[in-house]
UniProtKB/Swiss-Prot annotation:
Top-rank taxon, per record: Eukaryota
Phylogenetic classification of the source organism: Eukaryota, Metazoa, Chordata, Craniata, Vertebrata
Post-translational modification (record): Ubiquitinated by the BCR(KLHL3) E3 ubiquitin ligase complex in the kidney, leading to its degradation.
Record's protein name: Claudin-8
GO terms assigned for molecular function: identical protein binding; structural molecule activity
Gene that produces this protein: Cldn8
Amino acid sequence: MATYALQMAALVLGGVGMVGTVAVTIMPQWRVSAFIESNIVVFENRWEGLWMNCMRHANIRMQCKVYDSLLALSPDLQASRGLMCAASVLAFLAFMTAILGMKCTRCTGDDENVKSRILLTAGIIFFITGLVVLIPVSWVANSIIRDFYNPLVDVALKRELGEALYIGWTTALVLIAGGALFCCVFCCTERSNSYRYSVPSHRTTQRSFHAEKRSPSIYSKSQYV
């Protein structure tokens, strides 16, 4: 029962991580306008994401435009686009693999050893996905902070950390936690199986020992008669 609860908790974390990965990939709030020094133009707000940039003026609806070319992106955003797409695919693959290894799933049979190995595979993929999400989010955040404190960068070009980065860090931790729980499920299953097989063998050894101990006395009585 405890193992099944761990499976469900890990699956929920994996599902949340998968949704978060897709959300971070499509969100435009990776870089947002920084209102500092002479750039205190609060009626204009700019967002920059992996696929589009958005601008909102005072009393005007937010307007977004898809990038015309991949080369229009900075190197960190170009790499982040590829890594986040790969992370989305990995998260979906890990989630579907985890469903196949769940205790309530019947299409993969009832063998606990097979299912535990499937869950271990899903856990490893979830863990790798968390690292893949963590790399681009931290990379972009580092470039934003570096440019923010660089005196050679114009104030109008400086940006702040957007909401997508914070969600990305949270998503990476959730994915890693889900993968760790699936690995714990595998360890618990292997431990219970080893205990289950070790107890009968121990009892069999005791029985054979008692049988050997009784046999000489029986033989001696028959020989005496």
